[in-house]
Regions:
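Core catalytic region of metal-dependent phosphoesterases/phosphodiesterases
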Residues: 3-5, 12, 16-116, 169-173
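Histidine-centered catalytic micro-motifs
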Residues: 12-14, 144-148, 174-184
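Conserved beta-sheet core of the metallophosphoesterase superfamily
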Residues: 156-222
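Structural motif
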Residues: 6-8, 47, 126, 142-146, ...
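Conserved catalytic scaffold of divalent metal-dependent phosphoesterases
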Residues: 67, 87-168, 197-200
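Beta-strand-turn-beta hairpins that frame and shape the catalytic cleft
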Residues: 1-7, 116-126, 138-142, 190-194, ...
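Accessory, non-catalytic peripheral segments of nucleic-acid enzymes
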Residues: 2, 40, 219-321
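Active-site glycine-centered loops adjacent to acidic/histidine catalytic or metal-binding residues
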Residues: 11, 50-51, 84-85, 146, ...
Length: 321
């Protein structure tokens, strides 16, 4: 085994989308891929940056049962975990958290208080959700947290306007790895580097075109190094306008229909019956999910025959100009 290499991932959100079975399946398939990747790299240590579960107030029994099965995939690994805000009962601290149910697993260590811990020759500061800047351990080679840092992106559309300041957290360590924000971000400052690892796979349309995956950290040298490995196995989200729907073919050819969660933006006037048949044609291809968003009006249409195969469909002929 690689003594000095440690994997990092965060924000798994088990039970996302109302404990939907299909999303549990996405999570399980990702975990099988992830653990297989680490075994190939001879890595048996993993740090997790918070938000194992999605719902903080209660956890579905089916989701609990699934989590037990999921964690069996990690039996050969050492897991070092912190609770995130979705794991915490209280909104501002992690004194009561759902990761306590993992205490019976000997390969898992949960840090629910700010703690400096020696791991593979490095001093790591573990900071659960709600850790104040004053309580972040000092003189650490790296700090792991679930921080809300000012001027970083929550996602592709929203920036955090209030939170901890980067210059304050970098006084504690020159390297910060954190969960919480789902957009993967890596910023270098004069005093060090802050990395939001992001969620391991896309979970909604806010994640569009954001690289997902995991990091591998190397603790062997004095300065910690790290590499990012992209997840190419999980479904992605795609927004496409009706007028550019033909672009969907190329995306599907590359990724596969079953790995596409699609939102069609109705940006042109179209006859209702034609839109219904277009949607049926796409559903025939078997996408992971399909929704529509209406920016334009619909009109009553003629009874025009449209084939099931999307490849034979002329979208432009269906649009009312």
């Amino acid at each position: 085994m690689e003594k000095y290499k440690i994997a990092f991932f965060t924000d798994l959100h088990i039970g996302v989308h109302q404990n939907n079975e299909r999303w549990l399946d996405v999570t399980y398939k990702w975990a099988k891929w992830f653990t297989s990747e680490l075994k190939e790299k001879n890595i048996n240590k993993i740090i997790f940056g918070g938000d194992l579960f999605h719902y903080r107030d209660e956890i579905n029994v089916k989701t609990l049962h699934f989590t037990d099965k999921l964690l069996d995939l990690f039996d050969e690994f050492e897991l070092y975990m912190i609770p995130g805000n979705h794991d915490a009962y209280y909104k501002d601290n992690a004194t009561v958290h759902s990761l306590s149910i993992l205490n019976n697993r000997k390969n898992i260590k949960v840090f629910d208080k700010p703690t400096a811990f020696n791991l593979a020759s490095k001093q790591i500061g573990f900071c659960p959700w709600g850790t104040s800047i004053d309580d972040v351990p000092t003189d650490c080679d790296m700090v792991v947290g679930h921080f809300e840092l000012e001027n970083f992106n929550f996602n592709n559309h929203k920036i955090c306007e209030e939170g901890m300041k980067s210059q304050d957290i970098l006084k504690k360590s020159k390297l910060i790895f954190t969960g919480h924000f789902h957009k993967r971000q890596q910023r270098k400052f004069e005093d060090g580097t802050i990395i939001y690892a992001g969620n391991p796979f896309e979970m909604d349309f806010n994640d569009i075109k954001d690289q997902k995956g995991y990091y591998v950290l190397d603790f062997e040298e004095e300065n910690i190094t790290y590499d990012f490995y992209e997840n190419n196995v999980s479904p992605i989200h795609v927004k496409v306008t009706l007028s550019e729907l033909e672009d969907l073919q190329a995306i599907a050819k590359n990724k596969g229909w079953s790995n596409l969660s699609i939102k069609i933006i109705i940006d042109k006037e179209i006859k209702i019956n034609l839109l219904d048949k277009i949607i049926s044609s796409i559903n025939y291809e078997g996408p992971f999910a399909l929704t529509t968003d209406y920016l334009n009006k619909l009109t009553l249409g003629d009874n025009i025959s449209i084939p099931n195969d999307l490849g034979d469909l002329n979208i432009k002929e269906c649009i009312v100009e």
